[in-house]
A protein has these predicted regions:
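Histidine-centered divalent metal-coordination motifs
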Residues: 7-13, 118, 147, 177
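Mid-to-C-terminal alpha-helical segments outside catalytic/metal-binding sites
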Residues: 1-9, 13-56, 105, 223-227, ...
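A general structural detector for well-ordered alpha-helical segments in enzyme core domains, enriched
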Residues: 44-48, 72-79, 103-107, 130-134, ...
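Catalytic pocket-lining loop regions of alpha/beta-barrel enzymes
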Residues: 113-114, 124-227, 273-277
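Acidic/glycine-enriched edge-of-secondary-structure segments
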Residues: 24-37, 60, 146-148, 169-175
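Divalent metal-coordination and catalytic microenvironments
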Residues: 7, 49, 57, 76, ...
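Active-site gating/metal-coordination segments in enzymes
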Residues: 55-56, 63-146, 150-152, 194-196, ...
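Active-site environment of divalent metal-dependent phosphoester hydrolases
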Residues: 11-14, 64-67, 95-99, 122, ...
Length: 277
């Protein structure tokens, strides 16, 4: 089965270990679960994805301060180019940038395939007027992958995504972590089946729900609205693929989640075509 990882982090080699550890600590304190000792330099990503049988990967990283935006986007473009066709990259934006329009145009000129935002780490709410301006500036030209859900903060709760979904129907939004990290059932109630421009990814979900609960959520959103993702280096891709394939889904549902939905959003077509994308 073709597998596309729609949610994978990558860091410069010099800081990959430090950055990976910092993110792990950010979540490990909250979740109280064991997180693999992994780093996310490009070589680490490619090795882990190959071991898991993942054919294509979306790389992302977030700018925690505005002046990082263009440098990170150039880095992400280089990593995609250096991956031998195995990776695409989503760029980053920051709502406090002095030139958000310039950042958007630069991101698109680099050939980045989407925008990843992490409100909790970047310090803004999904429905903040400055964030809404970013969605407006992108104008539906590429999709947004948004971290959603964390009860410690009031930045990315599922309800805060709704104004963007309503205001920008031409823009595709992907709510990471099944639309609400650690409070999936609540997210499902307010988001599932309601918005034509909403997808969710299944990353960082298996640790907190049963296989049956995961399937219920998939079917509430519709398998045609769900994307596979590992959230590497948070989790081992091999383990995440194994857990996904073990879910009591139909073969059609697996195929949609593993490849077809993501390929549609990224205009990849079949794996043979995607190899040269």
């Amino acid at each position: 089965m073709q597998i596309l990882d729609f949610h994978c982090h990558v860091y410069p080699h010099a800081i990959a270990e430090k950055a990976s550890d910092a993110v792990a600590r950010f979540y490990q304190v909250h979740r109280g679960v064991e997180i693999p000792d992994q780093t996310a330099a490009l070589d680490d990503v490619l090795q882990a994805q190959a071991e898991a049988g993942i054919a294509k990967t979306v790389l992302c990283s977030a700018a925690t301060v505005p002046h990082q935006v263009q440098h990170i986007n150039e880095f992400l473009a280089r990593k995609a180019a250096a991956s031998g066709g195995r990776c695409l990259s989503f760029g980053t934006l920051h709502p406090d940038s002095p030139d958000p329009k310039g950042d958007v145009e630069h991101l698109l000129e680099l050939g980045l395939k989407g925008v990843k935002l992490h409100p909790d780490m970047q310090g803004f709410a999904l429905n903040d007027p400055k964030a809404m301006k970013l969605y407006e500036l992108v104008g539906g030209r590429v999709p947004f992958l948004l971290h959603t859900g964390d009860p410690r903060f009031s930045f990315s709760n599922p309800e805060q995504l709704i104004p963007a979904l309503l205001a920008f129907p031409e823009t595709t939004f992907v709510g990471a972590h099944m639309g609400g990290h650690t409070f999936w059932k609540e997210a499902t109630k307010v988001l599932a089946g309601r918005y034509e421009n909403l997808y969710v990814d299944i990353s960082s979900t298996f640790f907190g729900v049963t296989p049956e609960e995961a399937v219920d959520m998939v079917r509430a959103y519709g398998a045609e609205r769900v994307l596979f993702g590992t959230d590497f280096p948070m989790w081992c891709p091999n383990d995440e693929v194994r857990k996904f394939l073990a879910l009591p889904l139909t073969e059609e549902e697996r195929r949609l989640i593993a490849w077809d939905n993501g390929a549609k959003l990224l205009h990849l077509g079949s794996l043979a075509c995607a190899a040269g994308a």
